[in-house]
């Protein structure tokens, strides 16, 4: 570009984010084929993977339409080189990404046809969406945390109650030291506290910085692209993301249906478990549905699963169903069952990130070798130990949670939403089709957000939530009485429904 055009004539900055595309050449016959598309895609992925924010190029005049369709814009400067006429072109990478949606199907098809030898992935890695839009209102630089009082964060499933007073007192008493001191390398005290509370041996416990840490660590060790996995649908989105996008293995879905209240048909599931999967994932209670399989039924089901099939049971919300409903003791004696427990949602510790696996020691041995030192921070270890030492406090909060959920369900039904029964700290709702101004879940979520009420569009949390007779689904976390009232009023006002 510098050879033909002075930089001051170009309407963009020459900085470290600017890249020039040059010499992307294919034969004339291939210019409107997949070859040209693949070459452009590879160039854009190179720029994107290296942190580029804008591209510029000189494009031949006779194929200008092809560049424009791809998302490039003409600067309005014509360049001649010999007998060939060119146009100066540019585009932001954000615009190119937005335009690439129109070619997504074609590009996905190309991935299976090419031998990709470049040092970055064929597709831009995408994370799993988990909600948390309320931080857009609070601010992610944490300089306006007082704004949290102005909003209701019901789009993620954090506890509505604070941690045990024991947790707060211990952290406050020792906070400077806790922040400046390295934690025990292997979390020995935390492991012992968990094992004692759950009635298992320390060798049955593997700690982690929340359940996501454990999912990524375990699944990438156990599975390959040739593996086969089974998940519920709908269920917690991280599982499909890790299995399909990170590992790339085959994933089958056990569909749950609204006509059944999204309950799991154990007889059908038992048949599915005989198909020789490498991994089966069961979230119990399930999210976003809230449905729950009783302990005795689940243990009977899992007792007949072939030993070559690992079964991962996510019990993040099981305390809301009753502490006696956990299958941790069963998993500790099992050859192939692993329980994953987050301490975020039921102990009000989402901010410090602590969780663990409970399983037979032989299943955790290899994962223990892959666990980095200091995997759980010192404040998190101390908070978790103190929380486990105060079961009475949390048991009382779980009782209150059921009461608050019942009140929230009644309020949501009163403004026209259909609610599904569940045992967790959240409510899954279906919007009825037609009849009111706000017709779909995405619109409802956006309008509630403008009122400082953040709820989750659940329509993308499973294939079973993307259709049906209604206008979509939302998942709403249980808040305290005041927060629940704001949620109900926000939904009512956003839908235009009568008081």
Model features per residue range: what roles?
Residues 122-181:
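N-terminal "arm"/small-domain region of PLP-dependent enzymes with the aminotransferase-like
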Residues 402, 414-451, 467, 474, ...:
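Conserved PLP-binding catalytic core of the aspartate aminotransferase-like
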Residues 189-228, 246:
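Phosphate-binding glycine-rich loop
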Residues 296, 450-451, 461-499:
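PLP-dependent enzyme catalytic core of the Aspartate aminotransferase-like
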Residues 221-282:
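PLP-dependent aminotransferase-like
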Residues 1-31, 86:
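Conserved acyl-donor/pantetheine-binding loop and adjacent beta-alpha core of acyl/acetyltransferases
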Residues 263-276, 288-349:
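Active-site pre-lysine segment of PLP-dependent enzymes
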Residues 164, 186, 336-420:
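PLP-dependent aminotransferase class I/II
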């Amino acid at each position: 570009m510098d050879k033909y055009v002075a930089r001051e004539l170009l309407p963009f900055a020459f900085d470290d984010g600017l890249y020039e595309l040059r010499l992307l050449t294919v034969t004339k016959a291939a210019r409107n084929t997949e070859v040209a598309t693949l070459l452009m895609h590879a160039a854009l992925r190179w720029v994107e993977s290296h942190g580029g924010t804008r591209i510029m190029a000189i494009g031949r005049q006779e194929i200008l339409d092809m560049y424009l369709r791809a998302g490039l814009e003409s600067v309005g400067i014509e360049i001649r080189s010999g007998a060939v006429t060119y146009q100066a072109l540019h585009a932001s990478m954000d615009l190119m990404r937005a335009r690439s949606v129109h070619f997504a199907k074609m590009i996905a098809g190309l991935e299976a046809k090419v031998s990709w030898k470049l040092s970055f992935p064929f597709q831009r890695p995408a994370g799993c969406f988990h909600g948390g839009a309320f931080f857009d209102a609070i601010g992610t630089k944490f300089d306006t945390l007082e704004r949290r009082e102005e909003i209701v964060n019901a789009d993620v499933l954090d506890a509505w109650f604070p941690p045990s007073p024991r947790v707060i007192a211990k952290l406050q008493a020792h906070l400077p030291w806790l922040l400046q001191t390295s934690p025990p390398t292997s979390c020995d005290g935390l492991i012992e506290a968990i094992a004692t509370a759950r009635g298992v041996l320390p060798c049955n416990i593997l700690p982690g910085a929340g359940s996501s840490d454990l999912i990524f660590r375990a699944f990438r060790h156990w599975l390959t692209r040739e593996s086969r996995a089974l998940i519920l649908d709908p269920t917690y989105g991280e599982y499909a993301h890790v299995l399909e996008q990170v590992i790339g293995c085959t994933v089958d879905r056990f569909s749950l249906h609204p006509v059944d209240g999204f309950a799991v048909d154990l007889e059908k599931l038992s048949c599915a478990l005989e198909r020789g999967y490498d991994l089966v994932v069961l979230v119990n209670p399930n999210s976003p549905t809230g449905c729950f399989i009783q302990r005795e039924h689940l243990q009977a089901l899992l007792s007949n699963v072939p030993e070559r099939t690992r079964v991962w049971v996510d019990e993040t919300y099981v305390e809301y169903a009753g502490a006696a409903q956990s299958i941790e003791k069963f998993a500790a004696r099992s050859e192939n069952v692993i329980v994953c427990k987050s301490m975020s949602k039921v102990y009000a510790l989402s901010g410090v990130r602590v969780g663990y696996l409970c399983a037979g020691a032989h299943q955790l041995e290899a994962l223990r070798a892959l666990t980095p030192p200091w995997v759980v921070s010192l404040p998190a270890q101390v908070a978790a130990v103190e929380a486990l030492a105060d079961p009475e406090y949390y048991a009382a909060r779980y009782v209150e949670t059921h009461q608050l959920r019942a009140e929230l369900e009644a309020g949501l039904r009163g403004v026209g939403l259909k609610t599904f029964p569940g045992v967790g700290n959240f409510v899954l709702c279906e919007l009825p089709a037609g009849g009111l101004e706000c017709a779909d879940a995405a619109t409802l979520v956006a309008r509630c957000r403008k009122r400082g009420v953040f709820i989750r569009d659940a329509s993308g949390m499973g294939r079973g939530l993307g259709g049906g007779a209604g206008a979509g689904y939302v998942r709403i976390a249980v808040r305290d009485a005041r927060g629940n009232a704001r949620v109900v009023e926000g939904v009512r006002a956003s839908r235009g429904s009568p008081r």
